[in-house]
Amino acid sequence: MGWNGGLTSPSMEEHFYPFLIERRPSYMEEDEEEHEDEDLSLVLEKKDKDLLLAAELGKALLERNDQLMKAKDALEEELRETLETIEQEKHDMRLKMEVQESEWRAQVADLESDLAEARLQMQQLLSEQRECGRESASAAQELSEQNQRLVEQLAQASQVEQALNMELKSLREENRDLTISRGQFAPCLQSLRSENVLLLENKKEMESQTKQLQDENDNVQNQLISAKEGIFHLQRQKKDAELQVQQLQLEAQKLRDSQRTLQLQVKELQEELHMRDSQFSTHFSLHSEIQQSTAGQDHEMTTEAFPGLPCLPPSPYNLQKMGRNSVETQSITSDYMDTYLTEREGDLLRDSEEETIRLQDKVTMQHVELTTLQEEVQRLQDLLQQNNLDSIAKQAVLDRDEALMKKGELEQELARCQMEKESLNLQLLSTIQQKVMLSQELEAWQDDMQIVINQQLQSQKQQETQKVPETPQNSFMRRDSKQGRIFSFFKNI
């Protein structure tokens, strides 16, 4: 700044001398006139006037300069006061800024901790949201698959319905034909009904007869089993009897063999006796002893071969031969031996004949029983065949009843298919309702999450406003910074 406060001099400005500008053409004219007329007096007068005007102008300029100086001093004083006020306000603002900066740092630390917690909560919420999204996606996938299955089932049900409708149409046509033919064949139907009643009565009678025949068949089966057991027992007895006959035959053969052996021995003894006939009187005792020893040997051999036979005396036949050839003086003894031999042989023959007759009678009885049992078995077989014929007739009646029941069964099947179709439709509707409910729940969950986030942000804002009373400018700056942080946080997420 200069002496005049930085203001330019008024002498250098043309707008402070308007009269000079206005009179400049006149000066030029006067100069021309001076050159032309060379009127010096006029020039002098004009110069005097100019001097007067310059003096007046200088005086005005001095007054104007004084006013400007006063204005300058006032402005400098005002500027000084303003600068002092500004410096004081600047110092106060610096102190406030330091206090607010410390508060802001504390708030920033709190906000960072809150932001970390909010990030953790947001991560948890996002993980839960992803989990819910996966669950909702899986549920939607399951619902879509179930919907697809239901659509396929519905298509199948529609196909079945079409088939059943066609079948129902054919059945209705058949029913119509039957109703038409029923009017034509009403007498036949009445007769068939009467025949059916008779057949039902016969059926009941046949069922009762069948039941009786079954009972009889059971009894006959039991009798047949007992008869088979009796046949087996008789066959076993027959085998035992045959074995006994074979044993008796063997015993008889052994007796014949022993008899031949004894005959040979007797023959040898007879030869010896013929040779010693002359010495019979002297050796009679010896001959008797030999006979006794021979009879004892024969008896011992017979006992050893057949222990079951009764004890018999020495063979009368041998004694007879021996007595005939050796002792003529002992006629009484030989007669006694002949009588004993005859009686003994007769007893043996009678016993063998009785045993043979008994066995023959037993075999005959067994044969008769076997024949009776065979006849009974044949009768039972005939009865079973007759029962088979009755069962065939019964089966025919049952087939007719089954054919009559088919129509009702088909109608029941059609009604069941209709019910299944209705149930499938209801299931489809319930599935669609569940899908809509799940979508509504998902939207409600998203809205709840948004509300929770907004509530947390509002609570943080309320805490900040309660902690620090702020000016509008600072609150606006903080709001902008906070919104910038929130937006940057969501961008980072």
Swiss-Prot record:
Domain of life assignment: Eukaryota
Coiled-coil segments: 56-275, 365-431
Any one annotated GO CC term: cytoplasm
Record-level GO BP terms: Golgi to secretory granule transport; vesicle transport along microtubule
Annotated keywords: Coiled coil
Family, as annotated: Belongs to the BICDR family.
Protein name, entry field: BICD family-like cargo adapter 2
Organism: Xenopus laevis
Top-level taxonomy: Eukaryota, Metazoa, Chordata, Craniata, Vertebrata
Gene: bicdl2
